[in-house]
Amino acid sequence: MQQAQAQGLPPATTGDITPEPVREGIDLIVNGERFRHTGDPLMPLLWYLRDVLRLTGTKLGDAHGEDGYDLVLVNGKAVSAIKRPMAKLAGARVTTVEGLAHADGSLHPLQQAFIDEDAIGCGYCTPGWLIAGIDLLTRKPKPSDEDIDKLPNRCRCGVQTRVRRAIKRAAGAKA
């Protein structure tokens, strides 16, 4: 306090101290629609999507984001929604599995390829596979089997071979 007075500053009062800054909100776009999150900035994106927006396609798997179940596109890149806090999403464009279809209702080519190749087991991992596949096809339009096998997704139903065929079909490559 003496140091503040020596610098010509008025002494602090308890009314001058705030435990955390006032939050105006985190603006983001989810599946083409604008939203403002005014809650906890440390809330993981996964819980915002599922609990606030009621977009339940993105799943929780191992709670560490290592299994690919929770993948979403953030500014066009696949990221783990459980690892991404809302504070890191200001101005971001988020696409979930619910936002992959076109405005006219037609499916994304990878969604159609999953249907055509019967690449759906129980369906729990399917949203993550779709997001990871779209990210891969954006980076590598003609992915190899090895590229596809390196995706972080896990499946307990054993559809990996059909997923590989679906991704190659969507890429226009021969399975």
Feature-to-residue mapping (PLM):
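Signature of N-terminal electron-transfer/Fe-S-associated modules in redox systems
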Residues: 1-175
